[in-house]
């Protein structure tokens, strides 16, 4: 995955790891003015087309696997199942991305429609829609703020745990990456791991969690009921089809969605060129600019371009995915050196970031003491 090697764009040259500037000379208004007006239009018909398209593709994958893999000789079936898992997880991640767009009111002009579609899609993929919508909103409002960001908050050198030092070797990095990719999102939802530190235990299922305010608590409970309904449906499927069938056809692809989601967001927010800010330096546009686009090759399209339009998304989150590339290209001349896309092959980038981005510290000789950069051990 990842194109690698294409260097025609000045935002992706040899110095891709070079730090971005920290004092943008433009405003959000300047960026919006550069984007064609039609890019802000949200069509419920066009958005719904992508939902239907992905559902049809997901059904085709299901039908082929359910019908033909049981007919394949056992040794070959062991190869066929991972192919199904990858394909189904990929298309389901596309549906998850559409649910995420609903949370940003980028699906249609009607908030109710957005919330209904997002609630159904995310619940089916075991994500508490409203709960995650609200915590994710906090992330967008406080991106790369060391004091207030909701997730992906790196540690200072003095706070690095002993196990991080023990795992600072090739086998340890592989273990850390596998753990992060498979369990990172479920543990974030359940225990707020890697999330903002609150005065008490926080998770995404407790309506009284400090993550949420009083106006959001009823909808958090609604998210829980949505998941309970899905778990009840899973129970009925296990009774009818057996646990092995449910695991192969549904559970592993849904786990794959979590893997893809963590992989994408980890790479968007973890890079040697990206700063973090304390309260003396942070403002909204500085934080929103502190992300990087990535190239997932053919999966860019499957994931509805969320992989390589993330910088735009953090600046203007309500632009629908089918206008995102055009809008991104429109603001790139304004962004200049503040925009970066890293086309390093994904597995190589994953390992590099796990090796190089361990903790953050400000530069000792810098006048910006509230600007923090990644370092390795």
From Swiss-Prot:
Q: Where is this motif: Histidine box-1?
A: 100-104
Which UniProt keyword terms apply here? Answer: Fatty acid biosynthesis, Fatty acid metabolism, Lipid biosynthesis, Lipid metabolism, Membrane, Oxidoreductase, Transmembrane, Transmembrane helix
Cellular location of this protein? Membrane
GO-annotated biological processes? unsaturated fatty acid biosynthetic process
Q: Where is this motif: Histidine box-2?
A: 136-140
Q: In what pathway does it function?
A: Lipid metabolism; polyunsaturated fatty acid biosynthesis
Example GO CC term: the record gives: membrane
Instruction: Report whether Ion transport shows up as a keyword of the record.
Output: no
GO MF annotation terms:
oxidoreductase activity, acting on paired donors, with oxidation of a pair of donors resulting in the reduction of molecular oxygen to two molecules of water
The UniProt transmembrane annotation reads 55-75, 79-99, 112-132, 174-194, 220-240, 244-264
* Chain positions of motif Histidine box-3: 310-314
* Superkingdom in the source lineage: Eukaryota
Q: Does the keyword Transferase apply?
A: no
Q: What is its EC number?
A: 1.14.19.-
- Identify its membrane topology class: Multi-pass membrane protein
Job of this protein: Converts linoleic acid into a conjugated octadecatrienoic acid, probably calendic acid.
- Give the domain note: The histidine box domains may contain the active site and/or be involved in metal ion binding.
Say which family it is in.
Answer: Belongs to the fatty acid desaturase type 1 family.
Know the name of this protein?
Delta(12) fatty acid desaturase DES8.11
Give the species. Calendula officinalis (Pot marigold)
